[in-house]
Regions:
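Secondary-structure end/capping motifs
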Residues: 280-364
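Periplasmic peptidoglycan-binding/tethering modules of Gram-negative envelope proteins
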Residues: 375-453, 529-532
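Second-shell loop/turn segments in exported
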Residues: 74-75, 109-110, 182-188, 235-236, ...
Length: 532
């Protein structure tokens, strides 16, 4: 379950937590009245062995609605997440209401509220559901389950991006991914928050040993709340969690937000996963389902009756609470989907398969090309494409005012691009090899779309160069610009990029051998978060 509170509620909860957590929890831990619920590691296989045969849920908020009226009926499950609101608004309730968008399009949609992904995936496999809402992260986690069950699935629609609701909090001295080495890191097991930590570790320039040590020694908790409480009680140095704990960390002097999804639209994306058999048999119904949800976007922060009726967690919420929750998820447009389903969604799915494998779980990366399709989005192009634009997900831009701040900010994540240039020029010596090397950084840049990218060119020290190193500075700056231009040609906004020519001032090794000189002729790519 994912949600955000109003600003007033965040402040109140932060004050309460500051008192209760710091005083009450610490006292409780010392006295033995409160036990620290740190989970033993379990594998996905062990969890599924217990839960795979479960078709009912003890969750009191589960609401099943699966009446199949006709071939134009879709049975879909959603968890209690604000990002599904456009689907609910298009439907008008758990069932399609007369005069609603879906009713006008001629389809019936039955919504089941299921917070348990095991239960919803079982129902999808059994055929009780035609579709279910999952994050791309969760879809990767469930991939082998669907494959072993012999059910093909597709995700033809990304509904929303997480927009700051999930993140990583840390002690003040932990500022980069490299600082995670040796730190105690608390994560909620099998959660989107856990995948954030592992994704950053996997995409860092840490050694394989350091990566393995971090991942193998994650401290597992049952929920994001428990991970956060352990952090504020001093039991862990870092915690992957969600709101309101991110705000609490931001308001304290000895800790901070290391990362939140406000700096990345793509790390946590939600979409609707369909049974491929259903979609193949009923393409027009799927088309209209997507069309109706997209057309309901203008109701997102304006109409509230339907979501109050459908989702128990919002049933007593004020309109202000719901609007504040809406800020935690940004709805996608038709244009976003056309781009995502052939681009970032595939990158993210593949990365998440690697994440799950890193922590010992099964995931099928080979399903990436069969799961994501823009066929259905293209089928409704005439309804949207002439006027649609992508959501502007850029949160930060390089300006003259913040260039120095960018330079002074330590990079959250960085790496070295081993790109070689023709001697004394800024031209790639091997364009194909350079492309392969730089593409991995472009993929990261597309995922971390709310970060500033610093590209720093470096040369090896030349004993015959001028004392001020002006030639090397100019050459290294030109080489950084060459890398920047490659980024721009591949879809990265120039507004996000700052280039630096270090000359020969920052060698990484002694310049005593040809191998070492080659190591010093490098381009460093860093991803930085600049607070507004």
């Amino acid at each position: 379950m994912r949600f955000r509170l109003t600003k007033a509620a965040k402040v109140l909860i932060s004050l309460i937590l500051a008192i209760v957590v710091v005083v009450g929890v610490v006292f409780g831990l010392k006295s033995g009245l409160i036990k620290n619920d740190i989970k033993d590691k379990k594998t996905n296989k062990e969890v599924n062995a217990v839960l795979n045969d479960t078709e009912t849920s003890d969750d009191p908020d589960t609401v099943m609605t699966t009446d199949k009226k006709s071939a134009s009926t879709i049975n879909v499950s959603l968890d209690e997440w604000i990002g599904w609101k456009s689907i609910i608004d298009a439907n008008g309730g758990l069932t399609t209401q007369k005069g609603s968008i879906y009713d006008q399009l001629g389809i019936d949609v039955n919504i089941s509220v299921i917070n348990d992904a095991t239960q919803s995936s079982n129902a999808l496999i059994k055929g009780d559901l035609d579709a279910a809402g999952y994050t791309v992260n969760r879809t990767a986690f469930l991939s082998t389950k669907f494959k072993k069950a012999g059910i093909d699935v597709i995700m033809p629609y990304i509904t929303n991006y997480s927009n700051g609701g999930d993140g990583i909090i840390a002690k003040s001295n932990i500022k980069t991914v490299k600082d995670l080495v040796g730190a105690k890191i608390g994560v909620p097991e099998f959660s989107e928050a856990q995948t954030l930590v592992v994704w950053f570790v996997n995409n860092s320039d840490l050694s394989d040993k350091d990566k393995k040590d971090i991942i193998d020694n994650l401290v597992l908790f049952a929920t994001p709340d428990e991970a956060a409480k352990a952090f504020f009680a001093g039991q862990v140095d870092v915690a992957a969690t969600w709101e309101p704990y991110l705000t609490q960390a931001q308001n304290m002097s000895d800790c901070h937000i290391l990362f939140s999804t406000a700096s990345s639209s793509n790390l946590v994306m939600d979409g609707i996963l369909f049974s491929k058999a259903f979609a193949d048999a009923n393409p027009d119904v799927v088309n209209k389902f997507i069309e109706g949800s997209l057309k309901a976007a203008d109701k997102y922060d304006k109409e509230f009756d339907a979501i109050k009726a459908v989702m128990p967690m919002f049933s007593t919420s004020s309109n202000e609470d719901i609007v504040d929750n809406c800020s935690g998820a940004k709805l996608t447009t038709w244009k976003d989907n056309d781009n995502l389903l052939t681009g970032s969604a595939k990158i993210m799915y593949t990365d998440m398969c690697d994440v799950w494998k890193s922590i010992g779980e099964d995931a099928d990366a080979d399903m990436v090309d069969s799961i994501f399709t823009n066929t259905y989005i293209q089928n409704i192009a005439s309804e949207f494409s002439a006027t649609e634009t992508s959501v502007d997900t850029s949160k930060t831009k390089v300006t003259e005012d913040n260039k120095q701040t960018v330079a002074d900010t330590e990079a959250l994540l960085g790496g070295t691009a081993s790109v070689t240039f023709i001697k004394n020029t800024s031209k790639f010596s091997d364009t194909e090899a350079a492309s392969q090397e730089l593409d991995k950084f472009i993929d990261i840049a597309k995922i971390l779309d709310g970060t500033i990218i610093e590209i720093a060119g470096n040369t090896d020290p030349n004993p015959n160069s001028d004392p001020q190193d002006e030639y090397n500075k100019k050459l290294s700056a030109q080489r950084a610009e060459a890398v920047k231009n490659y980024f721009i040609m591949n879809g990265i906004s120039a507004d996000r990029i700052v280039t630096v020519g270090n000359g020969s001032a920052n060698p990484v090794v002694d310049n005593d051998t040809e191998e070492h000189r080659a190591m010093n002729r490098r381009t460093d790519v860093s991803f930085k978060i600049i607070e507004e």
